[in-house]
Amino acid sequence: RYLVFSSDRRQQRRIFLYDLSQRKLLPLPGLNQPRVFYDQPDISRNGRYLVYTSEQEGKTDVFFYDRQTFQSRNLTKTYVGQVRNPTVSGDGRWIAFEGDRTGQWDIEVIDRGVQPDLIESE
């Protein structure tokens, strides 16, 4: 039902959410702040949760956005290394992304169960 994508529309990299059944772009309050780079979005099955990368303060991090509360949360603030290509599970509980803290790209997983904890990949 939903399509999420990033675009350089209006000279700034932003995230857009398109409702395929209503055939229109939906608002994302709290996202797409001026002078902030947003990229690589993914959306949960029901369309409530988004994950994306954003470069703020010179570091790219993975963020989690709840469309019901309009809140974003930095999931990799203390992660040492680069991150890319986040994805969210259908129910919004699990977030996976590529990270290079070991010197090579590995898959890292965050369980949002109670508190997001970083689970190290094997």
Indicate where each model-derived feature is located.
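Repeat-blade elements of multi-bladed beta-propeller folds
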Residues: 1, 44-45
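A flexible loop/linker signature enriched in serine peptidases of the S9 family
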Residues: 7-16, 32-35, 53-63, 77-80, ...
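Beta-strand-rich domains and repeat architectures in extracellular enzymes and scaffolds
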Residues: 1-7
